[in-house]
């Protein structure tokens, strides 16, 4: 289902491209029988049977098992509010959902769409609807788009959406949807009305499908997902569970979490299969790595961000921002990666990383993700030996340079100041060249170009803290 937004937009043209395997392939290659149009309605862990309904004939049967694996996934949230079941109010989770949206767009000649929810799926759908020639608006209940980002990094996404003509409203939580006199749909609450649209797509998250497990008496974790141990075993002997429906552990915080990601589900499935087959295997948790490609720009992240840390009451962190190119500047095509590295102020332990750029962002995020899983520090990242050629990187890679800045801060060699540190007593020293200052002047700063700084140090105050930026 990761490809569904691109199927709606026509980037993926054929439904068959989304189907990775057929029942015949499973039977001939693996000797596995696949029962389509059959629904499991109950599990009896004591008797080791599942109740199954044949949806074609209506026949019910009890099927025995030796070992059982649950992989029910997650369902899109559809809040119980007025108008949520009106024609044209839709969700996207399955191929039939995507086909229904495509049909509705064609049959109703949709010209304007409203996407409620500006997370990963919401943004991907918004992009693909816009590329298909539909005017798109986004509504997000949180304080900024793409909530897994911190507020500062999300501003790059704001600029990207604005540049491509997608309207965004944040801090708006719909309490209902109504049909207007002109036939269009409109979301609303007590103090706000959305734009009118021909189609509303709800993309406000998913909930784990736990009904079967709950009815069977399986333990449900504090996150509302199925509890499993490190071998993917549930609380019932002979029953394993994997994927979007299960609870896992954040490897950085040690706390329980849910992470509905395809890569996580794949790894959990292998662990469960190994455990059933008697091979030693453990799923050690997640660090939270994700990526989105939006209008040619990559938005990637791993670990914790400063908003998450602040909400949890954790103040033992520091961060450094950077805008290094994906490869050396003298080779054509260099473009910046806007990045933020978060680490422990007390010991330099890596906590998280976000990278946004036209090229190379995901590669750097993967490097940090791998180190996060190893409990590494900024010292490890600073010394990481990464690929280099003029076309592919720099001798000191973009991610090395961020780590080196963090090391310099930890060691007191070059302390970092943030925007919040600026006050009336600060002396702001802008060391950019005059042409650069004209492009983006900073109010209240004194410009002494770096090329002239050594000869003009007498112009600097001795009684004020000097904050330098470039």
Placement of each model-derived feature along the sequence:
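Beta1-alpha1 glycine-rich phosphate/pyrophosphate-binding loop at the start
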Residues: 1-39, 126-149, 289, 363, ...
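A Rossmann-like FAD-binding core segment of flavoenzymes
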Residues: 35-52, 56, 63, 131-228
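Catalytic cysteine-centered active loop of the rhodanese-like fold, especially the PTP/DSP P-loop
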Residues: 448-450, 454-470
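Mid-to-C-terminal Rossmann-like scaffold of FAD/NAD(P)H-dependent oxidoreductases
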Residues: 245-359, 391-394, 398-424
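AMP-binding/adenylate-forming core of the ANL superfamily
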Residues: 50, 55, 68, 198-201, ...
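Rossmann-like dinucleotide-binding cores of NAD(P)H-dependent redox enzymes
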Residues: 18-19, 112-113, 120-178, 261-264, ...
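Glycine-rich dinucleotide-binding loop and its adjacent helix/turn
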Residues: 70-132, 167, 222, 228-230, ...
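FAD-site-proximal beta/loop scaffold in flavoenzymes
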Residues: 85-109, 183, 194-274, 367, ...
């Amino acid at each position: 289902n990761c490809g569904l937004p691109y199927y709606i937009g026509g980037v993926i043209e054929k439904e068959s491209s989304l189907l990775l395997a057929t029942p015949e392939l499973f039977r001939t290659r693996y000797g596995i029988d696949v029962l389509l149009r059959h629904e499991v309605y109950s599990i009896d862990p004591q008797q080791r049977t599942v109740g199954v309904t044949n949806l074609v004939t209506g026949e019910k049967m009890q099927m025995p098992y030796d070992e059982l694996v649950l992989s029910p996934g997650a369902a899109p949230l559809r809040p119980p509010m007025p108008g949520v079941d009106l024609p044209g109010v839709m969700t996207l989770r399955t191929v039939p959902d995507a086909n229904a949206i495509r049909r509705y767009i064609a049959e109703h000649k949709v010209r304007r769409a409203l996407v409620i929810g500006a997370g990963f799926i919401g943004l991907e759908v918004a992009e693909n609807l816009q590329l298909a020639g539909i005017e798109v608006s986004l509504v997000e209940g949180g304080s900024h788009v793409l909530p897994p980002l911190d507020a500062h990094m999300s501003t790059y996404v704001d600029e990207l959406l604005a540049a491509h003509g997608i309207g965004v409203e944040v801090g708006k939580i719909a309490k209902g949807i109504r049909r207007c006199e002109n036939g269009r749909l409109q979301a609303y609450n007590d103090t706000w009305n959305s734009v009118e649209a021909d189609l509303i797509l709800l993309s406000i998250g998913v909930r784990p499908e736990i009904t079967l497990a709950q009815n069977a008496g399986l333990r449900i974790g504090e996150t509302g997902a199925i509890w499993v141990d490190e071998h993917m075993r549930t609380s019932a002997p002979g029953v394993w569970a994997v994927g979007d429906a299960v609870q896992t552990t954040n490897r950085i915080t040690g706390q329980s979490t849910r992470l509905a990601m395809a890569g996580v589900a794949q790894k959990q499935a292998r662990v469960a299969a190994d455990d059933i087959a008697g091979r030693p295997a453990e799923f050690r948790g997640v660090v939270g790595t994700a990526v989105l490609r939006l209008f040619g720009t990559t938005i990637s992240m791993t670990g914790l961000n400063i908003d998450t840390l602040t909400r949890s009451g954790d103040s033992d962190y520091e961060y450094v921002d950077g805008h290094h190119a994906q490869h050396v500047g003298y080779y054509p095509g260099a473009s910046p990666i806007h990045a933020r590295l978060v680490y422990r102020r007390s010991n330099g332990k890596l906590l998280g990383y976000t990278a946004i750029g036209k090229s190379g962002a995901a590669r750097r995020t993967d490097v940090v993700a791998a180190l996060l899983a190893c409990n590494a520090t900024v010292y490890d990242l600073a010394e990481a030996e990464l690929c280099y050629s003029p076309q592919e990187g720099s001798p000191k890679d973009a991610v090395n340079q961020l780590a080196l800045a963090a090391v310099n801060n930890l060691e007191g060699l070059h302390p970092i100041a943030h925007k919040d540190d600026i006050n009336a007593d600060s002396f702001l020293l802008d060391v950019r060249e005059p042409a650069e200052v004209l492009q983006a002047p900073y109010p209240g700063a004194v410009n002494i170009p770096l090329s002239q700084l050594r000869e003009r140090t007498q112009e600097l105050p001795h009684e004020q803290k000097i904050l330098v930026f470039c």
